[in-house]
Amino acid sequence: MEHIAQILAVIVTGTLVGVEFGVAAFTNPIVERLPDDAYWQARATGGRILGTVMPFWYITAAALMVGVAVLGHTPAAIAAVLVMGVVMVLTLTTLVPINNRVVAWAGAGGEAPSRELAHRWDRLHWLRVVLLSASFVGVALA
């Protein structure tokens, strides 16, 4: 059971890290080159779609990590769970509110948020990618 939980945790967390890295390294830089209206529409659409899917992915990854930590009692697994907790707090307290402002603007019209707001999200997202990578390493080493 422990091995199955660890394999699933590595797969789910690894793909999560890959998607988040892809958004940070490829998608957002491509979107950055668009004119303002297209830029905000792309950011809002991406935020809406990923904002719907990612909570389930994060919860699944965290639950699997907790399972690995409970079953294995290894320091690496416990560290992975703690780092994932930090990721989730960062996400819920800073990244989600910024994302919600971008998504809300696209539906309401009016003056667009500044690109600096999106750049702040991008910087915080890179921090999240680094933390997720550390969590992935922890669960992989458990």
Region annotations inferred by a language model:
Residues 2-14, 70-85:
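Interfacial segments of alpha-helical transmembrane regions
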Residues 2-9, 13-60, 98, 103-119:
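Interfacial loop at the N-terminal end of multi-pass membrane proteins
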Residues 139-142:
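Juxtamembrane boundary at the C-terminal end of a transmembrane helix
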Residues 95, 99-100, 125:
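Asparagine-centered polar/low-complexity signal
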Residues 48, 55, 78-81, 119-122, ...:
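Internal alpha-helical transmembrane segments of multi-pass membrane proteins, especially GPCRs
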Residues 88-94:
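Mid-bilayer segments of alpha-helical transmembrane spans in multi-pass integral membrane proteins
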Residues 54-69, 128-137:
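Core segments of transmembrane alpha-helices
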